[in-house]
Structure formats: C-alpha cells, structure tokens
Amino acid sequence: MAVPKRRMSRSNTRSRRSQWKAAAPTLITCPNRACGQKTLPHIACPSCGTYKGRQVTAAV
C-alpha cells in the first residue's frame, strides 16, 4: 500500500478538496396532473401519494 513520503501542505490539501462538490438532487414533476409537485424520481409523491399512476399512500 502506498504511503506518502512527505506531509501534504494545507494549501495543497485544500486546493485538492476544493473540487469535491455535492451533487444537486434530481427532481421531477409529479406525473399526476392534479398535483404537479417536484419530487424525487422512483419515490411516491409525498403530497398526493401516487406512484406510477396509482395511489400507494394516503394523500397529505
């Protein structure tokens, strides 16, 4: 296993870590025409409770 020979400076460490970015969550509009809320894909809509065109949970 590789082991660093020298300690990495604070500026080099921070410049390397500056490229780490959190990805924004992908949002879709609810396919239920009456709802139209933004929701995560492959998850039942939290506002109307539908998933793939059928009611799976109680509406809030």
UniProtKB/Swiss-Prot annotation:
GO cellular component: large ribosomal subunit
GO biological process, one term: translation
Keywords assigned by UniProt, alphabetized: Ribonucleoprotein, Ribosomal protein
Record keyword GTP-binding present: no
Compositionally biased spans, kind Basic residues: 1-19
InterPro entries, alphabetized: Ribosomal_bL32 (IPR002677), Ribosomal_bL32_bact (IPR044957), Ribosomal_zn-bd (IPR011332)
Region feature (Disordered): 1-21
A single GO molecular function term of this UniProt record: structural constituent of ribosome
Any single Pfam family the record assigns to this protein: Ribosomal_L32p
Keyword Ribonucleoprotein among UniProt keywords: yes
PANTHER family: 50S RIBOSOMAL PROTEIN L32, LARGE RIBOSOMAL SUBUNIT PROTEIN BL32
Family of the protein in this entry: Belongs to the bacterial ribosomal protein bL32 family.
Annotated NCBIfam families: rpmF_bact
Name this protein carries in UniProt: Large ribosomal subunit protein bL32A
Species whose genome carries this gene: Nocardia farcinica (strain IFM 10152)
Phylogenetic lineage: Bacteria, Bacillati, Actinomycetota, Actinomycetes, Mycobacteriales
